[in-house]
């Protein structure tokens, strides 16, 4: 009876509510009310969502947009650092990654060719379940074992949700059942090989799954205030998952070496630094566009310094951010 009631509420209450919300927000964005142009559209031609074909604008160009972005930045990351401080940190990290890439390339000149041609050996593990088991085994030297060891089931995203779902995601368990966990794989755009391995590290072990189960069990044993479970720690949650994702590139490199694939192991190490480099670049652009009001021309100029000069690629990156 509970399942039937849940299905009834989803189909007759939740889904129609989301449809109404979507229609209402789109109406406000594009037309305003009572024949008046919306404040978003007044701030910049087309606002954030532009139906005229022009490129979108950043938050900084909206009324109080910079103030809003500052609060959003704090709420999502938990960091009280200013935008300028974050930019400096990102630039330092960017330089570190560039240096690491140069060192790897000098040690193995063929690496760049292997990476650009995607001419790496077949990854030793093919199935998600195998990868999760391998990650669980390798993380034991770096992280406490959570007992009993949580189980995880890998399921496919249903076809109707494939166009809207991430390549993979961990479904947070109920507070009272941390032993049975589920990770969903989107077969429509799921990564393979090394990329799937590091994605599962981000979502599973030692990522979100391990993070959630271990934290819930520790907090329960310590009898901490249940209100803690209502608080959002976005920077901590995603920061942890990204940290262990980078660590999993090292796990993958060791796995590849053990499988007799030293060149592929070096490619995995190179991928780790290029991934970090990419995230640094995207974060810098986010701060420039939404924090300082940079437009497409300024962003294209910055991307040009990174060796990205294709107008189509620059426009795609700008629009995405």
Residue ranges: model-predicted function:
Residues 1-321:
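N-terminal maturation segment of proteins
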């Amino acid at each position: 009876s509970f399942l039937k009631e849940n299905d009834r509420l989803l189909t007759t209450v939740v889904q129609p509510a989301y449809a109404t919300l979507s229609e209402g927000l789109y109406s406000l964005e594009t037309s305003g009310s009572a024949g008046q142009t919306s404040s978003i559209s007044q701030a910049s031609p087309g606002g954030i969502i532009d139906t005229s074909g022009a490129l979108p604008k950043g938050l900084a160009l909206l009324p109080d947009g910079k103030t809003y972005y500052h609060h959003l930045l704090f709420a999502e990351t938990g960091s009280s650092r200013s935008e300028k401080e974050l930019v400096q940190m990102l630039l330092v990290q960017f330089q570190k990654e560039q240096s690491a890439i140069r060192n790897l390339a000098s040690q193995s000149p063929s690496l760049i060719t292997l990476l650009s041609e995607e001419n790496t050996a077949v990854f030793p593990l093919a199935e998600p379940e195998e990868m999760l088991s391998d990650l669980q085994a390798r993380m034991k030297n770096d992280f406490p074992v959570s007992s009993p060891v949580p189980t995880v089931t890998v399921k496919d995203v249903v076809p109707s949700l494939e166009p809207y779902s991430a390549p993979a995601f961990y479904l947070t368990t109920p507070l009272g059942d941390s032993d049975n966990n589920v990770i969903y794989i989107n077969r429509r755009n799921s990564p393979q090989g090394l990329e799937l391995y590091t994605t599962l590290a981000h979502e599973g072990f030692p990522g979100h799954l391990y993070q959630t189960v271990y934290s819930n069990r520790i907090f329960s044993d310590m009898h901490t205030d249940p209100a803690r479970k209502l608080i959002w720690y976005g920077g901590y949650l995603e920061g942890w998952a990204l940290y262990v994702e980078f660590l999993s590139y090292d796990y993958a490199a060791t796995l590849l070496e053990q499988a007799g694939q030293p060149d592929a192991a070096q490619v995995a190490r190179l991928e780790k630094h290029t991934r970090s480099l990419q995230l640094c670049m995207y974060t810098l652009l986010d701060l420039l566009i939404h924090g300082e009001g940079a437009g497409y021309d300024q962003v294209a100029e910055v991307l040009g310094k990174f060796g990205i000069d294709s107008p189509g690629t620059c426009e795609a990156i700008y629009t995405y951010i």
